[in-house]
Amino acid sequence: MKTWHMVVVIGFLATLAQTSLALKEEDCEVCVKTVRRFADSLDDSTKKDYKQIETAFKKFCKAQKNKEHRFCYYLGGLEESATGILNELSKPLSWSMPAEKICEKLKKKDAQICDLRYEKQIDLNSVDLKKLKVRDLKKILNDWDESCDGCLEKGDFIKRIEELKPKYSRSEL
């Protein structure tokens, strides 16, 4: 009888340890958010077939930029990808596995997948553009898919950002 209770207690503790060690979204933010967004874009018939999921993921990856593009590269979703562990995404997705669990499996295959982090966004309403580096000003324009032809000095970049600010900044009411 005591042995049975001990087995139950050990089983409970093992389950508790497993859930506390589970991957959290902030531990692997790019993976979790990208997998969720991709899974939400799939229709029900595609979700059932892992081959269709792989094809859809490759198409999805063509439109990605920055960190998501790098994530696609690591998984093998791009033509230029060196490796391919796409089935580690497609099969669990076809089984309706949650994004956190999928990313946990992907991390075991390739740890650098969870090293991807989103960069902090610059709040244009509160930041003094004059205090930013030219590199940061260029990044703002690049994130907006805008260019600054003929910009040579910091003041030129600031002027261009100020021109485009009303178009891109989200003003809270």
Swiss-Prot record:
- What protein is this chain from? Mesencephalic astrocyte-derived neurotrophic factor homolog
Q: Does the keyword Hydrolase apply?
A: no
Can you tell me which family this protein belongs to?
Belongs to the ARMET family.
**Which pairs are disulfide-linked?**
28-114, 31-103, 61-72, 148-151
The record's annotation in InterPro entries points to: ARMET-like (IPR045333), ARMET_C (IPR019345), ARMET_N (IPR045332), EF_Hand_1_Ca_BS (IPR018247), SAP_dom_sf (IPR036361)
* Underlying gene: Manf
Q: Which organism is it from?
A: Drosophila simulans
A cellular component annotation (GO) from this entry = endoplasmic reticulum
User: Which positions make up the signal peptide?
Assistant: 1-22
